[in-house]
Amino acid sequence: MGLIGIGRKIEPEILVEIVKEIMVKPNTTQHYLQSILMKHRAGYFVLIDPDQHTVSSCARLGELAEASGVDALLLGGSFLTTDLDPIADSLKKATSLPIILFPGSVLQLSRNADAILYLSLISGRNPHYLIGEQVRAAPLIRHMELDTIPTGYMLIEGGTTTSVSFMSGSAPIPRDKLDIAWAHALAAQYMGMDLIYLEAGSGAKLAVPSEMISKIKDILEISVIVGGGIRTPSIAAEKVNAGADFIVTGSIIESDSSLMRAFSDAIHWGIEENDS
C-alpha cells in the first residue's frame, strides 16, 4: 500500500514534512542540524583553525565549546601547515559535537571528521573554486565516507581584504549590492545547494549586513549560515533576528574562549546580558 495508502488524504503541509524526512536520512549530520533548528531559534558553530592550535589545545577548546552550548565545530582555514588528522581525532575524543570540515583546499580533508561543507565559491568567477577543487576532492570524500553538505559559499565585503578573498582571487560582493547577493543565493538554491554561507571573512571589520541577510532569507527555502566580523553576542543576536539560521565565530574565540557561553545564549535564546 505504501506510505500514504490508497484513498487516504494527507494535508499538503504534512506531506511536505514527510518528504523532508525522506530526503534527509536520519542520523546524518544534516539531520542533526535540522534538529538544532527545532530546539533553538538558531545554531552556533565555532570555527577552529588548525594552524592556530596544537592538538592538545584543540581538544581543550572542543571540551569548552561543548560545555558552553556550542552546536558543532567547523575545522579548517585558508592555510594548512599542520596535519589535520591528529587534530580531528583529538576533537572526536574530547567532545561529542559533530566535527564538520570547512576546507580551504582539497588538502584539508580528514576521515576523522563527521562531515564536510562541500563548498562552491559561487560569489566568485574563479573556476578552480567553483568546481575544480570539488572534482579533485570528490573521490577522497567518497573513500572517507564523510557526510557531504552542499554549500553555496558567498564572500561579502567586510571592510578589509580577507585571507579567503586574497587566496581565492575572488572579489567579495559589495555590501550595498543586495540584489546581486540575493540573485547568487537564489541561484545556489536552484542548483541544489543545501546551505548558503554568507562570509565576511576571518578578522573582518564589518559583519554581513542584516539587510542582506533578511533579503536573502526571505526568498530561500534552505538554511543560511553567517560568519565573519561577529565580535560580540549582540551582533550575533542581530544577525539571527535578521534571519540567520547558524552563526559562526572564529577569531574572537581564539582570543577569548570564555565568550562562547555568551554567544551561545545570545544565538539560542536572545540573551545578551553578558555582551562585551
For the regions a language model picked out, list residue spans one by one.
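N-terminal amphipathic alpha-helix/helix-capping segment at the start of soluble metabolic enzymes
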Residues: 2-48, 140-150, 157
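Alpha-helix-loop-beta-strand connector modules within alpha/beta enzyme cores
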Residues: 84-105, 138, 206-231, 263-274
